[in-house]
A protein has these predicted regions:
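Nucleotide/pyrophosphate-binding catalytic subdomain
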Residues: 1-201
């Protein structure tokens, strides 16, 4: 068929590896929501594409969490945490998020984080990011879940950040596939992020 189902085998394998002390940053809510909607209605949503994406994300997030809960070891709690860029750009929200994540291992819980696409308006996000930059601050944009994962890793001082991806590396020029950088390194995660940012400028 034109629309395939989600790959439960991949999610099951990942879920069974999760333990308290791990922080999992996931993606796929929009795509899963679209599949779920089509499965129930026989066709995709019509109308405004951006509105459809937010509607799919809202529908897919619940399916995604149900699926993780199904496969994560039943001894462990699963906690849904939806973030947006302001959670990293506001000191009070950063501290609240950090404290919550650090409580999880003590409470036998696995936090599963996703960017809150269902209520995130791209136009508003850009305006807020520009205001931070104009005031001389360093704005964390969270343009994708890889960046979100790296910010989470810095926030809780993870020993290891593992990004699972189907891409071969980072394109220093998104328009030129020959600009592929297969390896970026740093003595710690902060230096690594600086080196990644330099590549993207």
């Amino acid at each position: 068929t034109e629309y395939s189902d989600m790959n439960y085998n991949v999610i099951a394998r990942i879920s069974r590896e999760l333990r308290p002390g791990y922080v999992w940053v996931t993606s796929g809510a929009t795509e899963i929501g679209k599949l779920d909607y089509i499965k129930r209605n026989g066709k995709p949503l019509e109308g405004d594409e951006e509105e459809n994406k937010t509607d799919y994300a809202a529908q897919g997030q619940s399916v995604l969490m149900q699926t993780y809960r199904q496969f994560v070891d039943s001894r462990y709690s699963v906690r849904q945490i939806l973030v947006e860029h302001q959670h990293f750009n506001d000191a009070e929200k950063r501290e609240h998020l950090c404290d919550m994540l650090r409580r999880c291992p003590k409470q036998n819980a696995i936090p599963i984080i996703n960017y809150n696409d269902a209520i995130s308006c791209e136009e508003n996000r850009k305006l807020e990011i520009n205001r931070i930059k104009e005031s001389g601050g360093h704005a964390i944009e969270c343009v994708d879940n890889d960046e979100t994962a790296s910010q989470i890793a810095c926030l809780v001082k993870c020993r290891t950040l593992l990004i699972l991806s189907t891409t071969d590396g980072i394109l220093s020029n998104p328009e030129d596939k020959a600009s592929l950088v297969e390896r970026v390194s740093g003595k710690d995660i902060y230096e690594l992020l600086e080196n990644v940012e330099e590549l993207q400028q």
